[in-house]
Structure formats: structure tokens, C-alpha cells
A protein has these predicted regions:
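A conserved acidic beta->alpha catalytic loop
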Residues: 29, 37-46, 89
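N-proximal low-complexity "stem/linker" segments adjacent to membrane-targeting elements
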Residues: 1-25
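Acidic helix N-cap motif at the loop->helix transition within catalytic regions
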Residues: 14-17, 42-51
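Short aromatic/hydrophobic "clamp" motif used to bind/position activated sugar donors
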Residues: 85
């Protein structure tokens, strides 16, 4: 079961590295991370490009003006190819490396329907 994580950004250079590294640290193997940037004026996209090689093809991103957070999230949803879609804000991060693995198992075992 593939998991798509969508992160909308705008001038998130101060926090995005922690967000991306928390996705990279996940033990669940079938993840794509989609970053939709609203045309940041800071170093947001430099961080994305710097960390891109560590994703080994599992990172997709776009940087262009949008109409705000929900427009960015909708763009991310259109780009997503996962069976499960999650939202991770650009100033949030997963507190441990097994979060997505646990979510996947809970959904597979019908313990939960949504998170």
C-alpha cells in the first residue's frame, strides 16, 4: 500500500529540513513525498533540491504561485499516486521513524478507517 505525503510550503526554510528528514527516516518503504511550494522567496527550494537525492525518486515537487494553502493541498492531491494520502505541514515532523508503518498496519488490519 503506497502512502503519499503532501507538504504545502511557503517561505518554510526555517522548518522544512526537519519535516523532510522525518519523512526520510520512516521505515515504511512505499512512500512518496509531494512538496507544493507557493513560490517561496527564501531558501525553501534550495533545501528541497539539496535533500532530493536522498529520496531516490520518491520526491515530487512543484514551486509556483498558488491561491493559498488549500490550493496547494489540492495540487498535491492531484499529484498523489498513493493508496493513502497524508498531510504533513512544513513546520511539522514525525516524532519517530515508525509512524507511517503503524498507520499502514492499522489500515491493513481494519483497526481504523482513517487517521
Amino acid at each position: 500500500m503506497k502512502i503519499s505525503i503532501i507538504t504545502a510550503t511557503w517561505n518554510s526554510g526555517a522548518t522544512l529540513r526537519d519535516t523532510m528528514e522525518s519523512v526520510l527516516s520512516q521505515t515504511y518503504p512505499d512512500i512518496e513525498h509531494i512538496i507544493v511550494d507557493g513560490g517561496s522567496l527564501d531558501n525553501t527550494m534550495e533545501i528541497v533540491r539539496e535533500l532530493e537525492p536522498q529520496y531516490h525518486g520518491r520526491l515530487r515537487y512543484v514551486s509556483e504561485q498558488d491561491k493559498g494553502l488549500y490550493d496547494a493541498m489540492n495540487k498535491g492531491l492531484k499529484m498523489a499516486t498513493g493508496d493513502i494520502v497524508g498531510i504533513l505541514n512544513s513546520d511539522d515532523f514525525y516524532t519517530n521513524e515508525k509512524v507511517l508503518e503503524k498507520v499502514s498496519k492499522a489500515l491493513d488490519n481494519k483497526i481504523i478507517d482513517a487517521v
